């Protein structure tokens, strides 16, 4: 994700072959090679799509049917018949957290994803078709990915897609368990990788937190201690920085 630390983006671009997820057009100024952009659409229009394509962006993620319809309308226009894009549909996930126990706000219901994938399978403008989802939790119980993918998406859908992007959410260190928990998480991911390889599906990850976290240090203030609990003023969390950096919520 380029939004949270744009100063690192040029370094990553020069020294790796990774892609960059981008949420708003203003962030594109940090990336020289726009073909490495994975643009996550939100309430766009055909003019914005045309501008993005003109800059060389061709990888898109849509998380609602309305934005998908706008994209398909753009591709239908006669002057755009030669445009080739790579498209991923973002699917909702149910996360069994203590706070929510509900589906994440962003994303298309998996039933609709199954239907739309089959409709889009043979579109001449779409050179690669995939599914995207993203964890917002670090709960260990949420990493049984093979089981979830098999239950969320039909066999026909899995045969139709080229790529599965499981987003991020990978832990650096869990505060409430042992530091070796990452091994269990990545064992689950390897299981999914084997499962996807059997179906000729490319597995994509977004390990930003896992890579960046060891280099950062949170300076905070302990406001209270009671029983076995410590209350801290973690201002980065309290101010909801994502909402300030990416004003689309």
Summary of predicted features, one role per range:
Residues 198:
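Substrate-binding and catalytic surfaces of secreted/luminal carbohydrate-active proteins
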Residues 163-165, 184-193, 201-211:
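Oxyanion-binding "anion nests"
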Residues 202-249:
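Charged (often Lys/Glu-rich) extended helix/loop segments that serve as interaction or gating elements
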Residues 141-146, 173-186, 213-224:
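Short glycine/threonine-rich loop-to-helix capping motif typified by GTGT followed
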Residues 96, 138-140, 174, 212, ...:
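Conserved protein kinase catalytic core
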Residues 91-93, 168, 236:
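Short, small-residue-rich loop/turn micro-motifs
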Residues 1-163, 191:
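Active-site-proximal beta-alpha core segment in soluble small-molecule metabolic enzymes
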Residues 134-136, 164-173, 207-209:
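Glycine-rich beta-strand-to-loop/alpha-helix junction loops that act as flexible
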